[in-house]
Amino acid sequence: MNQSLLSEFGDPLARVEAALAALRAGRGVLVADDEDRENEGDLIFAAQTMTNEQMAMMIRECSGIVCLCLTDERVRQLALPMMVEANSSHYQTAFTVTIEAAQGVTTGVSAADRITTIRAAIADGAKPSDLHRPGHVFPLRARTGGVLTRRGHTEATVDLMQLAGLKPFGVLCELTKEDGSMARLPDLVAFGRLHQMPVLTIEDLVQYRQLLSERSA
């Protein structure tokens, strides 16, 4: 990862701290993964604070595949089956069946409807009957152990929410360029600068979590 591009956002630990502060304040963050992995950047918001306006931005600026990152416990609570039994995707991205709120939505595809669906899924007493299947929100099951067990955007999202003291659920979508191609690190930096969003990498988060583990040992 080209650290010089990220230098304006501080060192790795400072970048994570800035992201946590932004999430606590209800703002978005941008997370890049390794250049030898997907080499993509995701726009991420906390599920519990995400607004209709933020969802509209995500739909407008990103790929359109809006994903709700959930813990394994929440996936079980909602009785969400995995999208396929045998996952043959390259990075084993753990999609469940897609969802829609059972109440309060129309077609399910608008920004407001997707927020309604997300709120139904993350409610404290959420139950399977609160959701219809399929729908326009794509849940992802995070692996237990977070980025220390899998260096994916799903795990990074849940880790960030937990470290920020928020509900362990986040919303992500891959940032794209105007021509529809995937945004790379220079594009993330420019987008973060324009929208005053922190930019960090999954490697930053791995280092941060490892440091916390060492301090508590």
UniProtKB/Swiss-Prot annotation:
Essential for catalytic activity, annotated site positions: H136, E174
Cross-referenced Pfam families: DHBP_synthase
Record: residues binding Mg(2+) 1: E38
Comment on bound cofactor: Binds 2 divalent metal cations per subunit. Magnesium or manganese.
Gene: ribB
Coiled coil in keyword set: no
Protein name: 3,4-dihydroxy-2-butanone 4-phosphate synthase
Binding of Mg(2+) 2, residues: E38, H153
Positions with a binding annotation for D-ribulose 5-phosphate: R37, E38, D42, R150, R151, G152, H153, T154, E174
Purpose of the protein: Catalyzes the conversion of D-ribulose 5-phosphate to formate and 3,4-dihydroxy-2-butanone 4-phosphate.
Family, as annotated: Belongs to the DHBP synthase family.
Enzyme class: lyase
Catalysed reactions, semicolon-separated: D-ribulose 5-phosphate = (2S)-2-hydroxy-3-oxobutyl phosphate + formate + H(+)
GO molecular function annotation: 3,4-dihydroxy-2-butanone-4-phosphate synthase activity; magnesium ion binding; manganese ion binding
Cofactor(s) recorded in Swiss-Prot or TrEMBL: Mg(2+); Mn(2+)
NCBIfam families found in the cross-reference section: ribB
One of the GO biological process terms: riboflavin biosynthetic process
Keywords: Lyase, Magnesium, Manganese, Metal-binding, Riboflavin biosynthesis
Known partners and oligomeric status: Homodimer.
Known pathway: Cofactor biosynthesis; riboflavin biosynthesis; 2-hydroxy-3-oxobutyl phosphate from D-ribulose 5-phosphate: step 1/1
Domain of life the protein comes from: Bacteria
One GO term describing the cellular component: cytosol
EC code(s) of this entry: 4.1.99.12
